[in-house]
């Protein structure tokens, strides 16, 4: 008696989708005057915002497909993207210029071209003269500037790392479409092909006990908890032993009855004669 298991394995391949996440930037410095201050932007021109240090941090967006940091500028019914750029030695958000390629490490460290020389500086001669009272974020700051490191903190409890995108299993029940798969088995002397139809239900391993050949009509799991049905094919019956009595036709049977009846009559007659004598 042979046992075999039919199992259907469904592989869910999911592609990593680009994510845009909310992020805030902070200053990390040995100078307590600016340490832990947040980065905010202030409008300095058409579509241009310079970055400054403040007690709170502005929420920006990070695109982990293009590795850019940006904000969304509403202009009437349209939305323009102001990307993080460096222009004239000033770190800013702008609708023009080449967006910086930004990488955020596990510890939140922000790295881009010129990030190693970022500093806080005042009196940079900005258009609206905000730097008279606030520290502007610049690269290659001059005398009196305070170097610092930019640290990113994602909003919403996500991990800081964006260098590697992870693919996670879906949390909702997947929807399966009908499919036909072919499974090759090697439990028989000859190769056997079994075709299964996968329906909307999630199939589970089904054990079928069989001897000889068997046709599997369905392997869908039943809604009850009963054991799966067992299908068996009875072995062919053995050859009956040869009969020792020769076959008798109806005519021969009738003749035998007549002969038997005549013998009985003769015996009775003989008995009667004996009594008479």
UniProtKB/Swiss-Prot annotation:
Q: Covalent lipidation (GPI-anchor amidated glycine) residues?
A: 253
The principal localisation class reads secreted
What does the UniProt PTM comment say about this protein?
The GPI-anchor is attached to the protein in the endoplasmic reticulum and serves to target the protein to the cell surface. There, the glucosamine-inositol phospholipid moiety is cleaved off and the GPI-modified mannoprotein is covalently attached via its lipidless GPI glycan remnant to the 1,6-beta-glucan of the outer cell wall layer.
Q: Has keyword Glycoprotein?
A: yes
Q: Where is the segment annotated Disordered?
A: 219-246
Protein localization: Secreted, Cell wall; Membrane
- Identify the stretch annotated as signal peptide in this record: 1-18
Key words of the record:
Cell wall, Glycoprotein, GPI-anchor, Lipoprotein, Membrane, Secreted, Signal, Virulence
Tell me what topology the record assigns in the membrane.
Lipid-anchor; GPI-anchor
Glycan-linked positions = 129, 178
Induction of synthesis? Up-regulated upon milbemycin A3 oxim derivative (A3Ox) treatment.
> In what ranges is there compositional bias, type Polar residues?
234-246
**Which residues does the record annotate as propeptide?**
254-277
Where on the tree of life does the source sit, at the highest rank? Eukaryota
User: Which Gene Ontology cellular-component terms appear in the entry?
Assistant: cell surface; extracellular region; hyphal cell wall; side of membrane; yeast-form cell wall
Instruction: Give the protein family.
Output: Belongs to the SRP1/TIP1 family.
Q: What does this protein do?
A: Component of the cell wall involved in virulence which plays a role in the relationship between C.albicans and the host.
Spell out the protein name for this chain. Answer: Cell wall protein PGA30
Record the organism.
Candida albicans (strain SC5314 / ATCC MYA-2876) (Yeast)
């Amino acid at each position: 008696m042979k046992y075999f298991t039919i199992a259907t394995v469904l592989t869910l391949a999911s592609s990593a989708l680009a994510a845009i996440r909310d992020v805030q930037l902070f200053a990390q410095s040995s100078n307590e005057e600016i340490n832990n201050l947040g980065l905010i932007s202030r409008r300095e021109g058409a579509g241009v915002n310079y970055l400054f240090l403040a007690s709170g941090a502005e929420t920006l967006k990070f695109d982990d497909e293009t590795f850019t940091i940006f904000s969304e500028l509403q202009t009437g019914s349209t939305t323009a993207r102001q990307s993080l750029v460096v222009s004239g030695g000033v770190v800013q958000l702008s609708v023009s210029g080449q967006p910086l390629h930004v990488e955020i490490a596990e510890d939140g460290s922000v790295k881009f071209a010129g990030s190693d020389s970022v500093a806080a500086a005042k009196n940079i001669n900005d258009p609206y003269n905000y730097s008279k009272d606030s520290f502007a974020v610049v690269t290659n700051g001059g005398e009196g500037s305070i170097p610092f490191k930019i640290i990113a903190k994602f909003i919403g409890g996500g991990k800081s790392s964006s260098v590697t995108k992870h693919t996670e299993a879906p949390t909702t029940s997947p929807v399966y479409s009908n499919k036909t798969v072919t499974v090759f088995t090697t439990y028989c002397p000859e190769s056997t092909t079994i075709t299964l139809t996968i329906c909307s239900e999630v199939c589970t391993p089904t054990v079928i006990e069989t001897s000889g050949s068997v046709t599997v009509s369905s392997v869908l799991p039943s809604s009850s908890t009963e054991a799966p049905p067992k299908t068996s094919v009875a072995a062919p019956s053995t050859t009956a032993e040869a009969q020792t009595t020769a076959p008798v036709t109806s005519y021969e049977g009738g003749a035998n009855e007549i002969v038997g009846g005549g013998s009985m009559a003769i015996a009775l007659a003989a008995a009667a004669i004996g009594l008479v004598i």
